[in-house]
Amino acid sequence: MNKGKYIFLDVDGVLNHHETYKKKHVNSLYPDLDPECLALFSKLVHSIDYVHIVLSSSWRLIESDMDRLEAAFKEFGIPKWIDITPYLEYEQGKTRGKEINQWLKENHVRKDQIIILDDNTDMADLKDRLIQTDFMNGGFKEVHLKKALHMLKGNHMTKETKEIFEALEAANNTLDNLYKAL
């Protein structure tokens, strides 16, 4: 299972955000997921050959959440995840990063083959593979898509590149806040 690229996907803060719950897409089977975030995620998945999704979200623990997510994926043409990360108990020092590391070890996947889409930072030694989204600021956005594509295509994340993406994200957040103020 070690060929290709892998996206470790959190749901809350990536495929939804605080505005999603205000809007509650009433005509949808998945009112707690944002259609714009799903469309961008679909674009990401279809832009990379041999990409696999591994669900690292707490949604993996609740069957009804996984059913809703699967329905949304189907509607947006996103392939179903190939696996879920193991659940570590708190006594084992549970963090999302440790769960992902455990999955990598069990499946013989290298760190340079992955990205992590998450709004949390508890990634242990995987922080350089994290594309951090923001639950309070729109979830998965175009800037995250561009950064994910950059990393999944094997491009090295230099200090300058990192600064460019940070500046783009800050500018994007400023624009979003200006639009909200109108």
Please describe what each predicted stretch is.
Residues 3-5, 49-51, 111-113:
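Short coil/turn segments at beta-strand junctions that form active-site/ligand-binding loops
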Residues 9, 56-62, 117-119:
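Short His-Asn-centered micro-motif
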Residues 48-67:
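Substrate-recognition element of Asp-dependent hydrolases with the DxDx(T/V) motif
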Residues 67-165:
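C-terminal cap/substrate-recognition subdomain and adjoining C-terminal extension
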Residues 2-47:
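Active-site neighborhood of HAD-like aspartate-dependent phosphohydrolases
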Residues 38-49, 102-110:
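Short, basic/hydrophobic alpha-helical segments
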